[in-house]
From Swiss-Prot:
Protein name: UPF0178 protein ABC1688
InterPro entries, A to Z: UPF0178
Top-level division of the source organism's lineage: Bacteria
PANTHER family found in the cross-reference section: UPF0178 PROTEIN YAII
Disulfide bonding pattern of the chain: none
Similarity comment: family membership: Belongs to the UPF0178 family.
Length: 154
């Protein structure tokens, strides 16, 4: 895929644990950053970080991201459904744990998500995500570095 040189790094920022890593690497590679979050999750960010503050409705940040991204942009999100929609638009999507999402894995990920939601609605307990660790943070840093380095070389 040919990536435009004006790539923007978007962050689904409400519960993103790797904001500092995104800021550091986007600065290193000279990329514009846009952090999208609801006004219920106010945060203090450096002046060079563009922010989009959205309503608290369930999908407001997702809708903003879907309307704003362009082919070749990068997005950090934990939301598998959002990731699947962004991939179709040609966006490079990473999880905060450093997983670079691929279109071919999304059907299985979404099916698992659906099964878990169904079980929770039926009153069953399901496992939540594992605790975020230092190795998750390092994996994210290396994955985002590799993505931005590849873009810089194209």
């Amino acid at each position: 895929m040919v990536i435009p040189s004006n790539t923007t790094v978007y962050v689904d920022a409400d519960s993103c644990p790797v904001k500092e890593e995104v800021i550091s690497l986007a600065r290193t590679f000279g990329k514009k950053m846009v952090f999208v979050y609801s006004y219920a999750h106010t945060m203090s960010l450096p002046k060079d970080v563009e922010t989009a503050i959205v309503d608290t409705s369930k999908e407001a940040a997702d809708l903003y991201l879907l309307q704003s991204v362009n082919r070749g942009d990068v997005c950090v999100t934990q939301d598998h459904a959002l990731a699947s929609l962004l991939l179709v638009k040609g966006v490079i999507v990473l999880s905060p744990r450093g997983h670079v999402y691929k279109e071919e894995e999304m059907p299985a990920m979404l099916a698992w998500r659906h099964t878990s939601q169904k079980a929770r609605r039926a009153g069953k307990k399901t496992r939540g995500p594992k605790k975020f660790t230092a190795s998750d943070r390092a994996a994210f840093y290396h994955a985002l570095y590799a993505v931005l380095e590849k873009i810089a070389k194209e």
